């Protein structure tokens, strides 16, 4: 019998940068394993990915991307852009389509320009202004579609991202709604925070 897991991660791109947000609950079937897991992983000081799917697969991909980013920096003397990293990850996923990494990833970063992309397990790549992944994504994307504006500030995007994850957590039993991990990436760098709710 298959065990059900789930999560919700979202990303929003603005003119000022990128906001990534995710719940912090790890679940396995009907059991909550922890309420304190990080689902947004930094790859460089300007690029991060969100995790939905197999934790081991995402961790392996994150290690590959970190190594590729360091190699790129060493070879070319400049950081890899988030767009280039998204294309690289798309190729890695597509090369493994017969034995796929069971992941759905959002990649966000600010190297030269704010970039946000969504990747499916087979390497399908979509660049967008906002996106959501995981079992709660249908609920989160509805909130994002309703609240997104092209001219929104990073602070407004952060509030919208938290609201989207929290809404998903209220409707999707596999998404937590008590704590939201938020990563904001701008030209000034990357900042992480956790937004907690008592109820």
Swiss-Prot record:
It comes from the Archaea. One of its GO terms (molecular function) is threonine-type endopeptidase activity. It is an enzyme of class 3 (hydrolase). Keywords: Autocatalytic cleavage, Cytoplasm, Hydrolase, Protease, Proteasome, Threonine protease, Zymogen. The keyword Protease applies. CDD domains: proteasome_beta_archeal (cd03764). Coiled coil: none annotated. The formation of the proteasomal ATPase PAN-20S proteasome complex, via the docking of the C-termini of PAN into the intersubunit pockets in the alpha-rings, triggers opening of the gate for substrate entry. Interconversion between the open-gate and close-gate conformations leads to a dynamic regulation of the 20S proteasome proteolysis activity. Residues 1-6 form a propeptide. GO terms for biological process: proteasome-mediated ubiquitin-dependent protein catabolic process. It is found in: Cytoplasm. It catalyses: Cleavage of peptide bonds with very broad specificity. The 20S proteasome core is composed of 14 alpha and 14 beta subunits that assemble into four stacked heptameric rings, resulting in a barrel-shaped structure. The two inner rings, each composed of seven catalytic beta subunits, are sandwiched by two outer rings, each composed of seven alpha subunits. The catalytic chamber with the active sites is on the inside of the barrel. Has a gated structure, the ends of the cylinder being occluded by the N-termini of the alpha-subunits. Is capped at one or both ends by the proteasome regulatory ATPase, PAN. Belongs to the peptidase T1B family. Component of the proteasome core, a large protease complex with broad specificity involved in protein degradation. This is Proteasome subunit beta 2.
């Amino acid at each position: 019998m298959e065990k059900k897991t789930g999560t919700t991660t979202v990303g929003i791109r603005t003119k000022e940068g990128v906001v990534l947000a995710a719940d912090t609950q790890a679940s396995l079937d009907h059991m909550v394993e922890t309420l304190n897991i990080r689902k947004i992983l930094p790859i460089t000081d300007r690029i991060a990915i969100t995790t939905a799917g197999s934790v081991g697969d995402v961790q392996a991909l994150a290690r590959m991307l970190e190594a590729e980013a360091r190699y790129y920096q060493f070879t070319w003397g400049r950081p890899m852009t988030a767009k280039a990293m998204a294309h690289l990850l798309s190729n890695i996923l597509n090369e493994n389509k017969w034995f796929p990494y069971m992941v759905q990833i959002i990649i966000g970063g600010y190297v030269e320009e704010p970039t946000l992309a969504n990747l499916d397990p087979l390497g399908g790549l979509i660049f967008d202004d906002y996106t959501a992944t995981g079992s709660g994504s249908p609920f989160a994307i509805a909130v994002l579609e309703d609240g997104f504006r092209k001219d929104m500030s990073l602070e407004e995007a952060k509030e919208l991202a938290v609201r989207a994850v929290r809404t998903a957590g209220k409707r999707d039993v596999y998404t937590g709604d008590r704590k939201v991990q938020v990563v904001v990436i701008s030209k000034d760098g990357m900042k992480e925070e956790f937004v907690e709710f008592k109820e």
